[in-house]
Amino acid sequence: IHVSHQDTSDLPFSYLIEQQSTSYIMPGANLKSVGTIRDAKKWPQRDRRADPDKLDSINYNLLSPYTIHKMLKGVSVLKELQRVSGETSDTYSYQSGKIKSSSLVNGLKYYGYAIDKFFGNSLITRLMNADCRTLEELREAFVPKSAYGDGDWVDIAGMIAPKKAVSDLLDAVERGDVSDVDSLNRCFEDIHSEYYSYEWRWACKAMEEYYGFSLAEASVDDLSELVQRWRNSVVSLDK
């Protein structure tokens, strides 16, 4: 039983441990758990729906704009705690709990691995699907083509999508443009089917902010470094 209520929504995949009437938060510790990664890989296999026309649009990706956005916020929270209290502090106060220095450092590391893995997955998929002969052609292939993807994302009963796409659909329902259940289901299916194009648009902007350079201007060395970071993250999370 926890002696105080902790809101760890800005520190996703965390453990909460009680020691001597104090709640200790271990940010991102669940990302390093083998069970978390393995369970995520098993989710699609556990889907027993036999009908090819599945009414529920479920996205099984553990790492998505929805979860990575939370991790990026978690990185900001942890770095701000370091800045305010100093990197040499033994413990950091967060809400009504405590974060040990070692847990904070590990949290930054685990979030970093997951963020690199997600961005690397998106980038490598793009590289594999790009029929390009020059760096300039590759940069052009990186330009997002989808209308949606920017901003916040939402999880709607298992469907992960840009909030704007869902809001626009709700507006269409209110206007009467979408007036029956079948049409509504088709709209949800359309949004679900465009997930990876929406994801890429979000990832491009997020990568620019996180790594400090634009893919539209990326050098071969920049891309090589991102692939290396991805490889390191995959190995580190699977240890």
Language-model features, listed with the residues they occupy:
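Glycine-rich hexapeptide-repeat left-handed beta-helix
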Residues: 1-77
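Acidic, low-complexity intrinsically disordered regions
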Residues: 20, 39, 149, 196-198, ...
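Long, charge-rich C-terminal accessory regions
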Residues: 53-187
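C-terminal amphipathic alpha-helical interaction region
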Residues: 155-239
